[in-house]
Amino acid sequence: MNLAKKMFNAEFADVRPISGVVANLMMYTAAMDVGDRMMALSIAHGGHISHARANLGGTAGQIRGHKVQNWVFDDEEFNIDVDASIDKIRGLQEKGDEIKFLLFGGSVFPFPHPVKEFREIADEYGMIIGYDSAHVSGLIGAGRFQDPLREGADIMTLSTHKTLPGPQHGCVLAKEEYADAIKRAAFPGMMSNHHLHNVAGFAVALAEMLEFGKDYTAQILKNAKALAQSLHERGFHLIGEHKGFTESHTILVDITETPLKDGSKVEETLEDANIIINRNLLPWDKKRGRDYRTPGGIRLGTSETTRLGMKESEMDAIAEFITRVVMKEEDVKKVAADVAEFKKDYQKVHYAYDNETKAYAHLRFM
């Protein structure tokens, strides 16, 4: 707990949640009554399924019965439209559809969210502000993104295996006034066992981030910019080009004008070529008759490649591998073999206490 509080300069930390989704459930439980109304990003705008309404199978709606209203989104800026969203909140309040909770953060997160811009209206109506930092927590802790707890968030959740490179686990950070409610949400609310082996791994990851995190996250961001630029130069359409593509580890690519045309096909074909990315909805996909099965986008991240010691030149090589598969439609088996050969030079974990053990080795303790 002390390591988490130190890394994020938080008044309170609970390291018991066994995942980021469980951390979000703890946050909802501490901040709202069952059935209360909240604001969150839609999935097509980068929101996570744990933020979604019941008819989409979302955790907030199905498990807690929350009525989820979506932020008004600026597709061009790929971010929340502040003025339009404030107008929406006021309109809902005036109709009697009271908003209790404002949630920022998401699973597609190239640019910081406008947290501080909503603190005034949150205070006006007595709303609590939450922030799901699952994908960007390592960047936040190292001072490389935004600082939600200083910008107005009351509670911040995270998972521990993305830009914060630890085991699969979760954490809730908050102002001290929410500590008791969060602790009750953890136990007896959510868990009778919080997987102590992963808590130990989380502690090691936090200690490593406190020592190596600034260098690690700086390179993550350089690599994300480099990969985005290399793909752009090869003819890919990247979201946020006019804003420098990204300010996080995440890159979002519209692949509808490539020969493969949809994100599912790109995802499957790149996996056959030993390149792991994931398909992703774009804000305008629904208008074009697309859904999660055939989305118009793909999402890429640079956390793991950076952890393996890759830098900007390697991002250019990766962009070329992707181009050979998606644009040039070269033989996938040939590209897969070339990727495997390329990867042989990157088998050690960097920015860590142990730089000698192979990254994917099965450790033996006996």
Model regions and ranges:
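Active-site lining segments that contact anionic ligands and/or coordinate catalytic metals
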Residues: 167-169, 246-250, 267, 272-274, ...
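Residues in well-ordered beta-strands of folded domains
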Residues: 69, 252, 278, 301, ...
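N-terminal entrance/gating region of PLP-dependent enzymes' catalytic architecture
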Residues: 1-2, 6, 357-361
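Conserved PLP-enzyme active-site core in the AAT-like
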Residues: 3-13, 18-237, 255, 302, ...
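Conserved small-domain helix->loop->beta segment predominantly found in fold-type I
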Residues: 206, 217, 221-267, 277-294, ...
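Short acidic (Asp/Glu) and glycine-rich catalytic loops that position anionic groups and cofactors
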Residues: 179-184, 199-209, 243-251, 294-302, ...
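A common structural junction motif
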Residues: 273-277, 326
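PLP-dependent enzyme catalytic core of the Aspartate aminotransferase-like
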Residues: 222, 289-366
